């Protein structure tokens, strides 16, 4: 059996981590395409093959161009992929093969929502990129929620849900004081963690308003694009992210929509209580291991107080829920899936 895990994204990004996990779980090679200027400084270890697209365009960051012109830009790689099953770990990649038995992961469909930044209006580029891959027979989805969204969209092929585990570096350390010392965080505050991009659906205004309600006893720790009056971090390696999780008292994740909810799963693995939105995807991923609320400031603030007062209980629930997303289950699911694809195709 020969499978190639094809990915893109900055080092330590969610997309990078996703392709790395599938490659590590299966032992199959990973190829990372550097397709935009923000990936120029990303580098990987010797176990990952890196192929550069055109990163010197004066009129573009390169991403759209390298997808649309991928068959030309990556023509050498295209030849090498002909004898393998290719797992495209995002549809934001150039389509380099014509094998309907290849695999694509669809992480979300938010670009179909007119309220989302990715919605293309008259011409939806993301939808155009997606449709190229829906000629495949097989799709991997990160959650049952996204599987349902794909079915509603009209995809009639085989959709398999494979839950991602927390990164191996994310674990409970049982030493909050030491974690705070290592990350330069105060010991005299209750620390609320916010970790996300700045997309509208991440609902960051609610995070800011919630902190104002909570008052001076609390301090916001922010991983991602900065928020005013927070202790801000960006570009952290997984080991540092783990220190942040272990240093904080609660994760506030008032999202309006997710394909999976990686920070929630990571919080469970690190023993951090979670306050998140009472929406379909969070009911699937978190269930009663988190406090689910309407994502408005007043209810978030109340839930944060409850979660900190009941820290032990929610830590215990989180650890129990983590079994659903265990590394052992993930490795088994990945290898079972790749083996079935190989047997069906004869590759």
Language model feature labels by segment:
Residues 1-347:
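Carbohydrate transferase catalytic cores enriched for Leloir-type hexosyltransferases
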């Amino acid at each position: 059996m020969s499978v190639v895990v094809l990915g893109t994204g900055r080092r330590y990004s969610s997309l990078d981590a996703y392709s790395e996990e599938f490659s590590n779980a299966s032992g199959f090679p990973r190829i990372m395409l550097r397709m935009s200027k923000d990936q120029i400084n990303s580098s990987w270890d010797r176990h990952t093959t890196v192929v550069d697209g055109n990163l010197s365009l004066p009129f573009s960051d390169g991403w759209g161009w390298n997808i649309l012109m991928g068959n030309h830009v990556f023509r050498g790689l295209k030849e090498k992929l002909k004898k393998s099953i290719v797992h495209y770990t995002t549809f934001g990649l150039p389509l380099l093969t014509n094998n309907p038995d290849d695999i694509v992961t669809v992480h979300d469909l938010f670009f179909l929502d007119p309220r989302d930044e990715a919605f293309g209006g008259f011409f939806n580029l993301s939808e155009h990129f997606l449709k190229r891959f829906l000629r495949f027979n097989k799709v991997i989805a990160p959650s049952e929620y996204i599987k349902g969204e794909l079915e509603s969209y009209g995809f009639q092929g085989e959709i398999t849900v494979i839950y991602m585990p927390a990164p191996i570096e994310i674990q409970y350390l049982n030493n909050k004081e030491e974690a705070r010392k290592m990350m330069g965080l105060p010991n005299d505050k209750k620390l609320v963690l916010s970790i996300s991009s700045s997309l509208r659906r991440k609902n960051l205004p609610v995070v800011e308003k919630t902190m104002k309600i909570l008052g001076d006893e609390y301090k916001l720790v922010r991983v991602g694009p900065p928020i005013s009056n927070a202790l801000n971090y960006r570009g952290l390696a997984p080991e540092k992210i783990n220190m942040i999780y272990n240093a904080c008292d609660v994760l506030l994740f008032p999202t309006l929509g997710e394909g999976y909810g990686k920070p929630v799963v990571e919080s469970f693995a690190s023993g951090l209580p979670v306050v998140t939105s009472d929406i379909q995807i969070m009911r699937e991923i978190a269930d009663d291991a988190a406090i689910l609320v309407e994502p408005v400031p007043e209810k978030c603030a109340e839930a944060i107080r409850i979660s900190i007062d009941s820290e032990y209980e929610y830590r215990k629930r989180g650890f129990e829920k983590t079994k659903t997303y265990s590394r052992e289950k993930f490795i088994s699911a990945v290898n079972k899936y790749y083996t079935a694809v190989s047997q069906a195709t004869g590759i």
